[in-house]
Amino acid sequence: MDFYAKDIACEELGQHWSMPDSQGTVRGPADLQGQVTYLFFGFTSCPDVCPTTMIELSQVKHLMGKDADQLQVVFVSVDPARDTPEVARTYVEAFDPKAIALVGNEVQLAAMASDFKAFYEKEPGPIPQTYTMSHIAGGYVFDRQGRLRLFAPYGMPVDKLFSDVQRLLLEPAHPAAGSDPLASCSLSHNGALAAR
């Protein structure tokens, strides 16, 4: 059975990044091991995509019941000028007390977005202080070994995302030789994701 989300396991994405979290601890791919992780790019002033995504992830965790802690939500701010670590932490914790907010500087953000081939762009408003951000809509889903497996598009039904998370949780934490779902991947394969 295929996943409902786009299978991107064979694409070389999200392997070489580092970004401080809202507590100042630098995080990287190795920190995504042990749980299924849903990582997405957004900003706290986002009027629609980001709060909707956080609400849907809360619904997935509710469906998971006692296993809810096996899904780690990671929010990467694309608006470091306004999203201070404290602002970002307060934002994500309003939806999920265990969510992690990553907030770096412009250079760190550009490098991380490049590693994920994630689009973001500042859109000027009528006056310099008012602007919004366009950004990729959807999330990157990692398995318990910290390997990027899926891209879940924005608007993916909660029950289907829940199903994909459950499938990843049912995989062995350390696959036996010959049973690794990524064994058939070619390291030379690479591709880009569509922007919102």
What are these model-derived regions, one by one?
Residues 29-57:
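Short active-site neighborhood of thiol/selenol oxidoreductases, capturing the structured segment around
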Residues 108-164:
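Thiol/disulfide oxidoreductase modules built on the thioredoxin-like
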Residues 1-30, 55:
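N-terminal "domain-start" segment that seeds a small globular fold
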Residues 9-11, 47, 51, 184-186:
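Sequence contexts marking disulfide-bonded cysteines in secreted/extracellular proteins
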Residues 145-147, 152-196:
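C-terminal lobe and adjacent flexible extensions of AdoMet/dcAdoMet transferase-like proteins
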Residues 52-112, 196:
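Structural microenvironment flanking redox-active thiols in thiol-disulfide oxidoreductases
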Residues 38-39, 73, 139:
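Hydrophobic beta-strand anchors of alpha/beta hydrolase catalytic cores
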Residues 36, 43, 61-68, 95, ...:
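Sec/Tat-exported extracytoplasmic proteins
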